[in-house]
Curated annotation (Swiss-Prot):
InterPro entries: Endonuclease-V. This is Endonuclease V. GO terms for cellular component: cytoplasm. The record marks 73 as: Interaction with target DNA. It catalyses: Endonucleolytic cleavage at apurinic or apyrimidinic sites to products with a 5'-phosphate. PANTHER family: ENDONUCLEASE V. Coiled coil: none annotated. The keyword DNA repair applies. Its cofactor is Mg(2+).
Length: 223
């Protein structure tokens, strides 16, 4: 694995990421959520993609793609591992969203190219990174109150907002993916909350990917 070449690709791609608002349809009619996981000991990459109406946030379509994993797990290079399955799920959608929430990092990445930025750039679609763990940068400790907020900083640059979406839950790291500003990324996530730790797009993507009870109930009601 030529990591030097991949690192150079990341730096080059990151320079093309658009960090300002460029939504073609604002407000959006459809928002997607995307989640990637692995099966069979990492041999299979699974990507789930859901479509929700906005502002009702009702699930109207979902697709799950499974493909052979083409790259080993290497921290800092996960987008190269996850992107092919995301693309496969994206291509199955009968209609394309105006905005995509990706479970993962956007520009809050050492080389400013997490999976949300990589996917958004390749598809030229507005994306937001909604990550559960910090990958780089520093932030001031948050209070325990829901709504507590702090900028994630690295080398004098704000990479994300660190936001406690729910009491007694770890915060989310919300960042520009592509064609969405940092502040707008936070605002869109806040508009898509319904009382859970995760915003509805990535919560539903996780539910579909893992066949959680909420998705099983949804299937039963939509047969």
């Amino acid at each position: 694995m030529d990591l030097a070449s991949l690192r150079a690709q990341q730096i080059e791609l990151a320079s093309s990421v658009i960090r300002e608002d460029r939504l073609d349809n604002d407000p959006p009619d459809l928002i997607a959520g995307a989640d990637v996981g692995f099966e069979q000991g990492g041999e299979v990459t699974r990507a789930a993609m859901v479509l929700l109406t906005y502002p009702a946030l009702e699930l109207v379509e979902y697709k799950v793609a499974r493909i052979a994993t083409t790259m080993p797990y290497i921290p800092g290079f996960l987008s190269f591992r996850e992107y092919p399955a995301l693309l496969a799920a994206w291509e199955q959608l009968s209609q394309k969203p105006d905005l995509v929430f990706v479970d993962g990092h956007g520009i809050s990445h050492p080389r400013r190219l997490g999976v949300a930025s990589h996917f958004g750039l390749m598809m030229d679609v507005p994306t937001i990174g909604v990550a559960k763990k910090r990958l780089c940068g520093k932030f001031e400790p948050l209070s325990a109150e829901p709504g507590a907020l702090a900028p994630l900083m690295d080398k004098g640059e704000q990479l994300a907002w660190v936001w406690r979406s729910k009491a007694r839950c770890n915060p989310l790291f919300i960042a520009t993916g592509h064609r969405v500003s940092t502040d707008s990324a936070l605002a869109w996530v806040q508009r898509c909350m319904q009382g859970y730790r995760l915003p509805e797009p990535t919560r539903w993507a996780d539910a579909v990917a893992s066949e959680r009870p909420a998705f099983v109930r949804w299937q039963a009601n939509h047969r």
